[in-house]
């Protein structure tokens, strides 16, 4: 079956408080430093405390300024399709990398390259790229990997020129990158982009929120990850004629309480769980 991203979650009975119901994640949910099936049942999740627009406004000190949210000029229901891997092993499991490579290969074949593969872990990206090189050689695809000596701007231009190539990138390729046209038809997100909680600045921010009686996960970690997720997905459709797929290889969007918030943050489009 197919479902649509961007649909509203079901409110819990009697939920009058706009605070998120996600709460603090369990230990296994916290971000770590280090063939077709049916869609999963809808998750129950109260509305997030802030919309993405309101969250950003508060972050820049403009929370009291009236906002205007303008509709997109793009027809995402026709231009974009979202795939979600429904059965991915935990990243700590020995079979995780094999499963990750399997799905990357599957979807890269589908579009014959023309793909961004976005990672949150630099070491994992390098290892996966190295293991997949024979696959790229077999298909005759160039693979550009961030951090291998080529400047970021040069790598991006080479990717645009070679219409059958793949680019593996981390943080800086999730945003501020514009590849209109058919050079990019596939964005693969390997993991939801939660910030590493032990970074000094992030840690200080989380501690400050908790000290003020807030929920560091619901008030900061989750909305920040959703914003970055939206930015990553946004690499795909840059003009009214662009078409392509987004692939999410992190089944937390299906089986964690907060996962529905990521799907709701996307434009309405067809979704298929694989």
Task: Please provide the spans of the model-predicted regions.
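ASCE RecA-like P-loop NTPase motor cores
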Residues: 1-20, 25-28, 33-274
């Amino acid at each position: 079956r197919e479902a649509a991203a961007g649909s509203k979650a079901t409110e819990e009975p009697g939920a009058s408080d706009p605070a998120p119901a996600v709460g603090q994640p369990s230990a296994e949910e916290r971000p770590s430093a280090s063939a077709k099936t049916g869609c999963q049942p809808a998750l129950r999740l109260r509305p997030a405390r802030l919309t993405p627009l309101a969250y950003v406004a508060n972050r820049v000190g403009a929370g009291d300024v009236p906002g205007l949210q303008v509709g997109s000029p793009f027809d995402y229901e026709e231009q974009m399709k979202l795939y979600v891997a429904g059965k991915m092993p935990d990243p700590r499991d020995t079979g995780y990398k094999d499963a990750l490579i399997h799905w990357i290969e599957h979807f890269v074949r589908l579009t014959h390259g023309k793909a961004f593969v976005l990672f949150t872990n630099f070491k994992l990206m390098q290892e996966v790229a190295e293991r997949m090189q024979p696959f790229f050689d077999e298909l005759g695809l160039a693979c550009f990997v961030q951090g291998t000596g080529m400047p970021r701007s040069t790598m991006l231009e080479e990717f645009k020129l070679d219409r059958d190539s793949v680019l593996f990138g981390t943080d800086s390729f999730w945003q501020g990158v514009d590849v209109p046209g058919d050079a990019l038809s596939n964005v693969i997100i390997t993991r939801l982009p939660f910030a590493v909680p032990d970074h000094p600045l992030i840690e200080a921010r989380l501690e400050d929120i908790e000290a003020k009686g807030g929920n560091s996960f619901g008030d900061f970690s989750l909305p920040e990850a959703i914003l970055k997720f939206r930015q990553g997905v946004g690499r795909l459709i840059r003009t009214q004629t662009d078409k392509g797929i987004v692939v999410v290889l992190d089944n937390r969007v299906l089986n964690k309480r907060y996962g529905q918030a990521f799907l709701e943050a996307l434009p309405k489009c067809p979704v298929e769980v694989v």
